[in-house]
Amino acid sequence: MQSNLLKVLGVLAIVATLVCFIFAALGMIGAVRIGNGCYMRYSKDGNGGADSITNTITLNANANYFNISKMLPDGTTKLIPDPNRYGEWLNTQVLVEKNQQVNLQVVGQVSLCLAYLPKNNLQFTERTRPGKSNLDDSNQMIPIPRVQDANSPPVSLIMDAKNNEWRNIAELYANDKVLVSVSPNFANTDATVDDVFKGVKVTKDCTQGKTSYYPICGKYSIYSGKYVTACELKQNYWKGNVHREECYCVFGCIYQEENEQWICDAANSASHCCTSLVCDSLPAWINHYSNMPEAYKDDGSFTFSWSDKSGNLLIDYQDLQCSNNVQIPPNGECPDIVDNRNPKDKDYIGGVHCTSGICKDGDFQKNRKFWYTADGKGGKGPTGLIYQMNNTGSVSQALPSNLEFAKFVPETEQPPEYKDKNGKYLYKVIYNIPFNSNIEKSYLQYRLWSPTSQDSSKNTGGYVLNIKQTKCYRENGNSFKDIFDDRGRVQYIIVQSSENPNTSGKTYAPQGINVDSDGKSHFNANEAGYIWMKILNDPSNNLKDYKDSEGSYKVHFSTSLKVGSFTIKVMNPLLQLFKTKVQGAATSIFKNMVCYKSTDNTSCTNFFTYIKAILILYVMTYGAMFLLGFAKINQKELVIRIAKIGMVSGLINGNTFEFFNNYLFDAITNFSDSIIANMSGYSLFTSTNTISNPFMFLDAIMSKIFFSQTFIAQLLSLLSLGLSGIIYFIITFIAVCIVIITTLRAIAVYIMAFMATCILIGIAPLFISFLLFDFTRYLFDNWVRFTIRYMIEPVVMMAGIIVLTQLFTIYLDFVLGYSVCWKCTLPIKIPFIGTILPIALLNVPIFCINWFAPWGMDYMSGMMGVNMQNIVALVIIAYGMYGYVEFSGRMVAKLTSAAGPSATQIGDRMSHDAGQKTLSQIGMDYRTRKGITSRAKSRLKQRNRTLEHAEQNSKKYMKKIGENTNEGTLK
């Protein structure tokens, strides 16, 4: 029991292993794609005789089509491009003839080089980091991710508010795409930014309540020093309101400033008669100061709103004073050094209703602004961030007259990957305009706004700008110059099928393709072969730009390849060679029989001599018999004999050969061709042949079978229709093979008939002379009968073949009348998956085997059927053609009453022998098959005899055992 279980388990293990191997093999096959090309049923012009081929290839920007497996640190493997296969040509699998027109359309986007941080960037300049402003601490250039690379974060640059100068964020060439974003204002939290120069993460405290911040916090201030925060009314603060003292002197008063001091003293000794100017002790509003900036608050109370006008981004705190000349302290004299200390901004700062004490209830308290934030109060953009384009990329502080303030792009243009899982922005885009300019190169520059007259070293904070850039961007095969001439042009070369330009070591002359704005173009092949393509890029620096390239083009091909003509390629050369040889041999026989224009009679026998002798003998014999009364003659017989003598004597004429060659020979040998041509409606001649070809009606069907790629694809596509498709394929293939065999038999019959006719005409002088005597008359009659038989035998045969060929062509189009594409045809799915996994995975294939399939067939929606009636009709017609060849031979034999071998029999034998010789190369000829069959029968007989002998021995043994058992029982 245990051993049986082990056997069962062993069998199951073997089966499981085989299944694994089969699935692995099918998986590899399913991964094979030669493109998604299609063979169209009709060409674009609607005419036949051409293969209308469409194909689509993927042209990689890096020109690398081979992957290798790389082991990752976590133990997993990853497929990466083979580092040794960049910059290679791709075989499009499109075969063209010389001067054949190829139409194509290039669709897609590629980036043909990688962008790197420029010098004098937002974080470092050549002044602060000489010679290394664009290099990291390892002296390596810093690459910028591409715009379309959603899986890579942008490069972050820390923008310090202390740097009040224009700096570069991107070097732009024509058609470059750039995506500039700003990191948010980190409120009440820490900020973390990748420092791409140091290769580390920088984390700083960005919580509110501080008056200075690191640049990565997303806020900055240009304010420092002191500013007025309140106003206080100070009594008796200064002396003002100058006036003259009242005079009480009887004799009148004098003015102190107009007299000497001793005079005033004397005048005042008796009474106060010398008066002076006096001042009142006046109050004034004095300033109360605080330090700038005020501590940042997340509620936005000290934050500027976004504006695109610089006047809205600056408050001149130095101009805000509680009273006039408050910054000039009183000197205690009368009058004071200034005479105006009236309130200035007291109401705005302290409030209208506050009239004493310290006042700080004015509107100013609500309008104090010190901070600019990256999220931009109001949400329109990062406040105070300005940008410009600069052609030189130089660092400068000058501000243009018109400032461009950065704004957030619309919500619909914000990349979804720039948000976290909670929908909060990690980066917010402020610039996404492709660089399209007549200028070859320019730099995108940014700076934080601040007055140029202000000392920026006292500024605090800053922003973090993030950059993605797609450099050397091209669309739809268009090309133009950047630092490399004509970068992005799609190039092609045409090489022979056995040649690989990537390994041949040859030097080629690539042709560039000029496309329109939609990527459409066409060209004429300069030679025959396969088209190879690649995208032109800078090959220098060890193919660095190819290695940095990304993206691909879809190149859609459409071309019409003229199908080779069976008539021109096969029949015309065959008939040209055969007819020339046979006609030459026949005329040579005729000429040798009559020694036509021969100066040396040793190489020929002049049959005219024998004809003369026979004719003389005939006249003498018949005349003697008539004179002696042995022969009776009437008028009818006399006329017949004179006609015979005249016909035979005509052969003695020296112009006999010209007559036969110029009139009779061509008329008789071409008789069949003319009748066949009239029946089929096809011409006997083409532009390339001078020998008549009656098989022109076969050109369409045979050219399609032998030379049409579309037909081969249509036939193979039957295999994609499932099990029924295999049956369809076998039946259709057999029908096509029968037609081919029938065609070859018909050609053989025609050749034999033509050769027999030519030979019979060549020996005509001999048989015509047999007309004279009654005992040789039957030879002449048979000669005439066979000549007529061989003349009409091809005509009768072709009459039926022509009709059946047309029917076969029609029904073949019914069966295979569809366009064909190379695509997924046989999906491999896990059986019983619905009982294990959710029903949603029931119809999901693991992989798919690609094959030729009819246009429009979808493996997911079921197989496409073929009308079986048409296939049956196709087979019936094919068998009818095959049988008609032999039937036509028997029909002609009865019509002409000519016994003996016919051209049909001879041609059949010839085609049979040729076929057997061909099959013998693979061991499938009749003799080999017969030998295999006989040996198999012999082995089978030997096996049967062995089994019979073993059975007899077994019966004898059992009988002996039974006898021994009976004897033991009796005892």
UniProtKB/Swiss-Prot annotation:
GO terms for biological process: protein secretion by the type IV secretion system. It is found in: Cell membrane. The chain crosses the membrane at residues 611-631, 721-741, 753-773, 795-815, 832-852, 865-885. Belongs to the TrbL/VirB6 family. Residues 933-944 have a biased composition (Basic residues). The keyword rRNA-binding does not apply. This is Uncharacterized protein RT0030.
